[in-house]
Amino acid sequence: MSHHWGYDSHNGPAHWHEHFPIANGERQSPIAISTKAARYDPALKPLSFSYDAGTAKAIVNNGHSFNVEFDDSSDKSVLQGGALDGVYRLVQFHIHWGSCEGQGSEHTVDGVKYDAELHIVHWNVKYGKFAEALKHPDGLAVVGIFMKVGNAKPEIQKVVDALNSIQTKGKQASFTNFDPTGLLPPCRDYWTYPGSLTTPPLHECVIWHVLKEPITVSSEQMCKLRGLCFSAENEPVCRMVDNWRPCQPLKSREVRASFQ
């Protein structure tokens, strides 16, 4: 039985180290990105997204966020390039968000918090399966995309509409024919650094690529996220808001930029 971690005062990020001591590790995420301190690296490649909408399969409320899950049994939906060696398979995406505008993202840029942050998660095919990839420093590649309230994002509406069927913890629904490329901003410039999962078990297995350019979603779309519940159907209602981890110490790491 895993420890019931969450985002509340009694089980939130300040307590995670009690059950997951790696929370105080050397390469934890998220971090505060400083544009001045990031080093431009001309050797970094463009990110190459090659997704097949046919691999989308389900949307799940796991009591911490919602995951859109993909069939990762073949190389139909993959990420390559960036700071990566080899091929990384798409497994899921999820979002972290706030209770109000001005907070919700996990990474920050020059002290600025965005309203939400989308994480697209991939695992290194050389490790054979996701669970094995978690044990390696180059096991996962996560692309982080900042979200801010502004114009509606038509490409995310299908996701927003599906939330009605997974309002409470433990619910899941079929979610098919979806290509997450539509969620990316036009500019694919990024910062990259070695880090971790931002939720327990907090494994230090992630090569992060945080895109410089945010996407916008409407306030209505944002409100639908805040309408989800941390709680199960048979429990008192607990709204799913502020499911983000604060920035962690950079320690000896370097942040590199793909752009000048």
Curated annotation (Swiss-Prot):
Zn(2+) binds at residues 94, 96, 119. GO terms for biological process: carbon dioxide transport; cellular response to carbon dioxide; regulation of intracellular pH. Keywords: Cell membrane, Cytoplasm, Lyase, Membrane, Metal-binding, Zinc. GO terms for cellular component: apical part of cell; cytoplasm; plasma membrane. Its cofactor is Zn(2+). The keyword Disulfide bond does not apply. It is an enzyme of class 4 (lyase). It is found in: Cytoplasm; Cell membrane. The keyword RNA-binding does not apply. PROSITE patterns: ALPHA_CA_1, ALPHA_CA_2. It catalyses: hydrogencarbonate + H(+) = CO2 + H2O; urea = cyanamide + H2O. It comes from the Eukaryota. Inhibited by acetazolamide. Catalyzes the reversible hydration of carbon dioxide. Can also hydrate cyanamide to urea. Belongs to the alpha-carbonic anhydrase family. This is Carbonic anhydrase 2. It comes from Gallus gallus. The lineage of its organism: Eukaryota, Metazoa, Chordata, Craniata, Vertebrata.
